[in-house]
Amino acid sequence: MVVVSVPAEVTVILLDIEGTTTPIAFVKDILFPYIKENVKEYLQTHWEEEECQQDVSLLRKQAEEDAHLDGAVPIPVASGGDVQQMIQAVVDNVSWQMSHDRKTTALKQLQGHMWKAAFTAGRMKAEVFADVVPAVRRWREAGMKVYIYSSGSVEAQKLLFGHSTEGDILELIDGHFDTKIGHKVESDSYRKIADSIGCSTNNILFLTDVTVEASAAEEADVHVAVVVRPGNAGLTDDEKTYYNLISSFSELYLPSTQSKV
């Protein structure tokens, strides 16, 4: 087994989600397809609710901004007309946005509400790799703080870790960051995270599967290890040589405690 020693000054472990704590396949093959497969039923069930109407209004506004794009799907203004026709327009718009991998606030808001309903109803559980929870428990016992940094919203992060295949594991997480603090490929984001936590950047070890993020973190003087999981993007030979690589959280070692973390 490969063992990566955690530098003695590290007191915070910062975790990516997709491809690090959670299989990419769960996000790609379960989480996002769930939206496409269930959006019509969700809208029909919740159409009269204020939250749903706010989501639709935001999507309509986005559709107006997208009107100049090829293939964009308009959403008609609410009237006394056919509700099913309105719902179908929203379904078609969502499908179009997702097929183009759009990350609009309007789309993310509806997706977040749909996932919340699915998780709380027990229709879905978030997968985490088997090595994650035991390792995080050991890190915390060793005095480490553990934070999440993901492009998914903090609300979505809490849904995932609150309804995981390992149960509700939110108690193991000290805090959450999303792109409101900055994008993961920008080094300044990691400085802001350190400021928010109240530590130096070199007190942080960031675990991610994306080398562009690892590089940005390193520029901010954050320690990094690149996580190699099934389904993750391949690494170049140079990246394999340059970065500390782990395929399991159990491969991290805390010299200060003389125990594998």
Swiss-Prot record:
HAMAP family: Salvage_MtnC (MF_01681), Salvage_MtnC_euk (MF_03117). It comes from Rattus norvegicus. Substrate binds at S150, S151, K184. Bifunctional enzyme that catalyzes the enolization of 2,3-diketo-5-methylthiopentyl-1-phosphate (DK-MTP-1-P) into the intermediate 2-hydroxy-3-keto-5-methylthiopentenyl-1-phosphate (HK-MTPenyl-1-P), which is then dephosphorylated to form the acireductone 1,2-dihydroxy-3-keto-5-methylthiopentene (DHK-MTPene). GO terms for cellular component: cytoplasm; nucleus. Mg(2+) binds at D16, E18, D209. Its cofactor is Mg(2+). Pathway: Amino-acid biosynthesis; L-methionine biosynthesis via salvage pathway; L-methionine from S-methyl-5-thio-alpha-D-ribose 1-phosphate: step 3/6; Amino-acid biosynthesis; L-methionine biosynthesis via salvage pathway; L-methionine from S-methyl-5-thio-alpha-D-ribose 1-phosphate: step 4/6. Its main location: cytoplasm. GO terms for molecular function: acireductone synthase activity; magnesium ion binding. Belongs to the HAD-like hydrolase superfamily. MasA/MtnC family. It is found in: Cytoplasm; Nucleus. It catalyses: 5-methylsulfanyl-2,3-dioxopentyl phosphate + H2O = 1,2-dihydroxy-5-(methylsulfanyl)pent-1-en-3-one + phosphate. Pfam families: Hydrolase. InterPro entries: Enolase-ppase_E1, ENOPH1_eukaryotes, HAD-like_sf, HAD-SF_hydro_IA, HAD_sf. This is Enolase-phosphatase E1. PANTHER family: ENOLASE-PHOSPHATASE E1. The lineage of its organism: Eukaryota, Metazoa, Chordata, Craniata, Vertebrata. Its EC number is 3.1.3.77. Binds 1 Mg(2+) ion per subunit.
